[in-house]
């Protein structure tokens, strides 16, 4: 019987072990998409206890705790820190086979040096040991990043953000590069005209100009885009239900925008036309700046209306959607390609039914200018687990070039999430190692396969994003 989480965890062949230990393990981390708040990094924040660094804002854990019958007061409520942690430890034991079980123990082992299994009987001991370590300089925010060999982190930032904390980080002694990434979702969220107009007021202030018409809107966003570029931004990110590619005229978009400015309710058709125009304009900006654009699509948000009213967004009530994607995605990319403004792009689907659909569509738009120009992104969110990542890499291998893949990202809000890169690398090495052992890949090419592992773990991302 193998030991849990030993040095060969997930590595089920000698070749897999060789690939991981000799090639993957040593590579630095490029975390090109996450949801870290830059303020704690800038301040080199010292976390008070495990719930603050581990449970706060982690809707993965919150969903599991709710499913285990834990009352909300222990999750997002005001119960004492240890009582919240105790409920998490109780729930974790029931979460076997959920990726949370592996992630939790990897984080305890790699960051805190604790190899005990977390359960109700060990909860107090682990809590006390981790909390004591969190009070030391080695566990401040910046120290954790450096200790985990993190070379680059890209945060997720709204166009109105002043990026002052990124400036503060650059001026610090932190070796890790912390760069902004452009996330302009609110600039196209015209479906709620009251909220949208409130946002435009903030955008006017950030861009130092009035926004009276659609051209003003694009000019204001371009000013902010240029500012982000001056601060080292190399990526954009867009959270969308599907790809908006409805036909429209400039006159229609102007009329829709002015109608929204007058706070008149828009039709579904008008909303989709406006979204289509905005998604196109964002893509043009990215292409002209030689950025990489990312598209996370397919989530239905805030499904539980009662809890959304109580807790707000990003609290564990989102799900996999089933919107049509094939035709609008092809229209969207084809227009950009015809106009010569199709930037390097990464696509993340939330519905696994789309794996092959997405791969075959985006690979219709590789143009020979850049290796791996159109990227099929790593398994995202609900697919960020062994089977989801294997399916993503299998679809990428079956229909494209796994060797050109830019690899893993945490997509996380937690400073303890970096072992997910290790998790991914072990899964990658296990896939390749198994196929060498089974004679599906030549053992004589093991040197190249080792280089391939290093590329997917680090080199491809470094070159693709020009970090």
Map each language-model feature to its residues:
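Divalent-cation-assisted or electrostatically stabilized phosphate/pyrophosphate-binding catalytic cores
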Residues: 323-329
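Short, basic/hydrophobic alpha-helical segments
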Residues: 332-338
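C-terminal amphipathic alpha-helical interaction region
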Residues: 293-295
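Short glycine/proline- and charge-enriched loop/turn segments
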Residues: 308-316
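Metal-cofactor-binding active-site regions of metalloenzymes
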Residues: 2-289, 341-343, 347-359, 363-467
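Hard-cation-handling environments
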Residues: 299, 304
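A short acidic, glycine-rich active-site loop
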Residues: 267-268, 317-323
């Amino acid at each position: 019987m193998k030991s849990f989480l030993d040095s060969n965890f997930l590595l089920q062949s000698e070749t897999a072990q060789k690939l991981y230990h000799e090639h993957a393990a040593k590579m630095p981390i490029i975390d090109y998409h996450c949801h870290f708040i830059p303020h704690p990094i800038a301040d080199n924040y010292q976390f008070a206890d495990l719930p603050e660094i581990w449970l706060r804002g982690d809707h993965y854990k919150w969903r599991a705790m709710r499913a285990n019958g834990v009352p909300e007061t222990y999750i997002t409520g005001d119960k004492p820190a240890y009582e919240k942690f105790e409920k998490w430890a109780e729930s974790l034991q029931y979460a076997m086979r959920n990726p949370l079980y592996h992630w939790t123990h990897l984080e305890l082992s790699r960051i805190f040096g604790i190899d005990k299994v977390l359960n109700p009987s060990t909860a107090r001991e682990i809590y006390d040991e981790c909390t004591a370590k969190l009070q030391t300089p080695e566990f401040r925010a910046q120290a954790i990043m450096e200790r985990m060999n993190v070379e680059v982190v890209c945060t997720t930032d709204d166009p109105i953000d002043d990026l002052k904390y990124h400036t503060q980080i650059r001026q610090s002694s932190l070796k890790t590069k912390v760069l902004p990434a452009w996330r302009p979702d609110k600039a196209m969220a015209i479906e709620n005209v009251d909220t949208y107009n409130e946002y435009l007021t903030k955008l006017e202030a950030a861009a130092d100009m009035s926004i009276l018409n659609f051209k003003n809107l694009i000019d204001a966003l371009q000013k902010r885009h240029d500012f982000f570029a001056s601060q080292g931004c190399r990526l954009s990110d867009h959270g969308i239900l599907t790809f908006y590619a409805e036909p429209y005229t400039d006159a229609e978009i102007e009329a829709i925008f002015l109608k929204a400015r007058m706070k008149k309710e828009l039709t579904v058709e008008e909303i989709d036309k406006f979204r289509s125009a905005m998604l196109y304009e964002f893509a043009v900006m990215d292409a002209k700046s030689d950025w990489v654009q990312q598209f996370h699509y397919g989530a239905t948000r805030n499904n539980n209306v009662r809890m959304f009213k109580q807790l707000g967004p990003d609290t564990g009530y989102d799900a996999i959607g089933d919107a049509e994607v094939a035709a609008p995605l092809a229209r969207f990319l084809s227009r950009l390609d015809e106009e010569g403004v199709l930037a390097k792009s990464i696509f993340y689907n939330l519905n696994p039914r789309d794996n092959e659909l997405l791969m075959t569509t985006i690979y219709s738009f590789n143009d020979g200018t850049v290796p791996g120009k159109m990227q099929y992104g790593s398994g995202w969110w609900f697919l960020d687990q062994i089977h989801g990542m294997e399916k993503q890499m299998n679809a990428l291998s079956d229909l494209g070039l796994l060797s050109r893949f830019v690899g893993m990202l945490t997509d996380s809000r937690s400073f303890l999430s970096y072992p997910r890169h290790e998790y991914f690398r072990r899964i990658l090495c296990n896939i390749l190692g198994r196929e060498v052992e089974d004679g599906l890949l030549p053992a004589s090419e093991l040197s190249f396969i080792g280089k391939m592992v290093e590329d997917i773990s680090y080199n491809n991302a470094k070159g693709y994003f020009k970090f």
